[in-house]
Amino acid sequence: MTVIDANGLIMGRLASNVAKMLLSGEEVSIVNAERAVISGSKVTTFEEYDVIRNMGTREFGPYFPRRPDRILKRTVRGMLPYKRARGKDAMGRLKVYVGIPYEYQDAEFVSVEGAEMTRLSSNKYVTIGDVSRQLGSKF
């Protein structure tokens, strides 16, 4: 089992690497999901997520999550063939957590190569936790 600390990692790059791991058969747990970052302007990012969240109706969807762990899991799902058996099995091997659960306190965390926040050329970024709070989550 691979345990990844999402603190300071770019969400999209993290998600694509995790999707590859899952499709190859690995079990992956991601901790500190609220500390992963989305690159870009804070205002623009908030507006984009507000549009996505308010799309559709309560009755018919689409249903978009507000909690940071579920936002990250939904992002990984978008990079998998989740409607097919292979993708469903891969999603079953993924666990995402806000903070660090008790069972992972002593685990050795792995970082994803090439997904560090230091590769951003500017300081324009927002954490998933901030986006989640903007959407009304109380995590």
Curated annotation (Swiss-Prot):
Entry-linked Pfam families: Ribosomal_L13
Keyword Ribonucleoprotein part of the UniProt annotation: yes
GO molecular function, one term: mRNA binding
GO annotation, cellular component aspect: cytosolic large ribosomal subunit
Record keywords, A-Z: Ribonucleoprotein, Ribosomal protein
GO biological process: negative regulation of translation; translation
Entry annotated with the keyword Transcription: no
Subunit relationships: Part of the 50S ribosomal subunit.
Function: This protein is one of the early assembly proteins of the 50S ribosomal subunit, although it is not seen to bind rRNA by itself. It is important during the early stages of 50S assembly.
Similarity section: Belongs to the universal ribosomal protein uL13 family.
HAMAP family in alphabetical order: Ribosomal_uL13 (MF_01366)
Protein name per UniProt: Large ribosomal subunit protein uL13
Organism: Methanococcoides burtonii (strain DSM 6242 / NBRC 107633 / OCM 468 / ACE-M)
Gene: rpl13
